[in-house]
């Protein structure tokens, strides 16, 4: 099951090439913003799994091309990035030096969003 936020941070599940909204199925999770909603769902996922699976089966949802997919964590606390963290196609004798940098949490965008 692939969870995602879409449009105005509605919670959804990816079903084939469609997005099925599930916010109404988890609205009793105490939250004032999307970050709390997804954290509450993850924390109590086993309590909601059957309800979500049943709700997703009964809906076709919206084509993913017709919704705006949003960042998975609307307000992350910290983002640590690795510039190189793998052996490039087997052509290196040894791993590249570790190059770590941080990004501001306000720099998170969703797929196909414009970076400013």
Walk through the language-model features, giving the residues of each.
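N-terminal non-catalytic cap/leader segment that marks the start of a structured domain
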Residues: 1-98
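Structural signature of FAD isoalloxazine-binding scaffolds in flavoprotein oxidoreductases
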Residues: 94-111
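Glycine-rich, charged/polar anion/phosphate-binding loops
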Residues: 113-116
